[in-house]
Amino acid sequence: MNPVSYSELLRLTLPQIALTVAAFFVLACDGMLLRRSPIAVRARIAMLLSVAGSLVALALLPLTAPVQLLDGMLVLDARTGVVQVVLLLFTLAVTLLSGSVLAQQGREVSAFTTHIGEFFALLLFATVAALFLVSTQNLLLIFLAVEFLSLVLYILTAFNKHSRASAEAALKYFLFGGMSAGFLLFGISLLYGVSGSLDLQQIALAASQPDSLLLVAIVLVILGFGFKIAAAPFHLWAPDAYQGAPSLSAGFIASSSKVASFFVFAQVLFIGVASASGNAAWHLSAPGWMPILAAVAVLSMLLGNLAALAQTSLRRLLAYSAIGHAGYLLLGLIAHTPQSLAALLYYVFTYALAVLGAFGVLAILETNGIDSLSSLAGLSRRSPALSACLLVFLLSLAGIPPLVGFFAKFWLFAAALQAAPAFGLLWLVILAILMSVVALFYYLRVLRQVYVVPMAEDATPLSSPTLARITLLVMAALTLLLGCAPNLLMRWLR
């Protein structure tokens, strides 16, 4: 192991330290100074402290030349820096939305939680885990970060103590998560047995030699990460978790967690076991992780999009939609080129932006008693601003130009087509396009309720927190801006 520069290590981990200090400060302030204060006051102060911690972490991000410490335990480069910036921005958005919604509910917040400080501290702890997860190439630290992040997400899912659905969803999430952790740890132990190292670079050297044990290890790792990204058939936790968790907890799971999980999954496959990729092309099929991922992608696209057609709950619709999007994202891994990795990251960033915005709108709607498709009738007349935001987010998820979701799909599908000779992945791209058409149908079904179906005669205008409304409008504007200038983000990922 190379000598450790502790000053350099401290400098590179300052964002995580800032978030950790902010989390403990939020807990101490809420628990000791504000426990008897009105819930609205506690929510606003916890939100401000969390926002301050996130902004300090953003300012301390080490955007420097590529650096590697502790033999791959801490690896930072330009691409990792972009991922960390995105994760912190999503944390900021969730914090602003949560604080404003909780503050508006005031004493009625018991419908969600009275543990204000704990909620915001957990968001910050989850972000710390995600930042460590995307900045390491050591399998042991990857496993520890994944499981710490998962543990926080289990708690966030169960945070509504007054909801049996929340507790049931968290239990299912925990049980499936524990099983997936076992698969992932077993796979990591086999990779260590094959290579004698936990560093992805060293594993890559050992993986260049054919070994049946290596293929077993790869299958187990795919099983473990398949759960984290909610890909079929490892998706069974997702619909219940998305439906039972508090709206903004579900939004955080669907956005930040998915960004971090896909990035580290790509790192493991592209760096550690790239030589065992095989081939998923229709005319050049060869054993490896590519054909396995191709089967998972097909199942995810079919099951996710077809099941979403039958949903009447907005949350479950977004959950099955997430499964379908996981199938599209796997195309970026199957293509296995630098262009496909950039397209995958672009897609997962823009998907996370849109789905977090959709859950933000849903959080406000649920405070007004709207939680199903039928109750959306006439929403455009009751709240034009929220309806416009929902329109932008859903059409971006559907991939409609000129929104950013269209360019994300275009670049991802184009990278998949160019990856294999003779358009070997054309069959997967055609299926993805067909399933995108199916997805458009159920997104338009939601928008039909919002804009076409008349509202009930006794319906009243919706109340929505000003800060939450501004946050959602900024996110919708960003979705439009990135669609009008798609290279604005892509140039940082190439």
Curated annotation (Swiss-Prot):
Protein name: NADH-quinone oxidoreductase subunit N 2
Family affiliation: Belongs to the complex I subunit 2 family.
Gene behind this protein: nuoN2
UniProt feature coiled coil, ranges: none
InterPro entries: NADH-Q_OxRdtase_suN/2 (IPR010096), ND/Mrp_TM (IPR001750)
The enzyme's E.C. designation: 7.1.1.-
Pfam families in the record: Proton_antipo_M
Main location: membrane
GO BP term, example: ATP synthesis coupled electron transport
Keywords annotated in UniProt: Cell inner membrane, Cell membrane, Membrane, NAD, Quinone, Translocase, Transmembrane, Transmembrane helix, Transport, Ubiquinone
Catalytic activity: a quinone + NADH + 5 H(+)(in) = a quinol + NAD(+) + 4 H(+)(out)
